[in-house]
Amino acid sequence: MSVSQAVRNPRGYLVRTLEMYRALLFDPEHFYDEYLGSRGLRSEILMVAFVGVVGLVGNYFARQEVQSVFVEAAIPINSDTNFELIRLVIAPIVGIFILWIGLTIALYAVSWLYSTIGQFYELMKRSAWAVVPLVVANLLHSIAIGYAATQVTEDQVDPQNVPQPPIDRAHHMWDTAAGEIYVTATILVGAVFVIWAGYIAAYAVRDVRDLETSEALRVAAVPAGLYAIWVLYQGVSAFL
């Protein structure tokens, strides 16, 4: 449905959009057969960017809140510290694009064990939609870290415990919010959505490589399983 049709019939556009995402999440086979367009990657790039921005919003708010507390506590924040804080803020949007590309490469490489047909470009277009479940993980983390940042007070800032090296100082500041147990819990919960993304990715690679569904599931289980293990490791490490 075009933009002009959406303007003329917003209700119909909304219904079709909801049906499309329901199919993607719960019936990816139908989604790829019915809804995936044949044009360029514009829609996919925008969609992946949106998933990253959802995570970035909470990080940006947390940085503003935490930095203001440390400034009030007379803790110097130089350009190197500020740069590292910015890097932490934009990590979700940079990371989601790296994840998309990495997922595509992994699916293409592992599926080579079963088939050599299919174009990398087509797989990249399809695998972009597999990251959609991660928008929920990013949303939960954004809400959690945003709330945690509002709870940081000047009384919690001990100048004696603030590291001197700029990068260490940035991480110390960040951890005053990111280190809260409920923020860490959202990282662990994120592993569930990684597995969900892997399920969708199986159908992304299936038709491109002309695989059996069982073969596609085994292919997708490799990158999804490894990434889920890494996410769990990150979450558990934060608890320790």
Residue ranges with predicted function:
Residues 28, 69-84, 166:
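Perimembrane loop-to-helix junctions flanking transmembrane segments
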Residues 6, 10-35, 89, 93, ...:
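Hydrophobic alpha-helical segments of integral membrane proteins
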Residues 18, 89-98, 185-195:
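Hydrophobic alpha-helical transmembrane segments of multi-pass membrane proteins
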Residues 60-77, 154:
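Interfacial/capping segments of alpha-helical transmembrane domains
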Residues 59-67, 107-111, 115, 141, ...:
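Membrane-water interface at transmembrane helix exits
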Residues 122-234:
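Hydrophobic alpha-helical transmembrane segments and adjacent short intramembrane/lumenal linkers
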Residues 1-58, 77-79:
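N-terminal juxtamembrane cytosolic/stromal segments of multi-pass membrane proteins
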Residues 79-157:
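Alpha-helical transmembrane segments with an aromatic anchor "belt"
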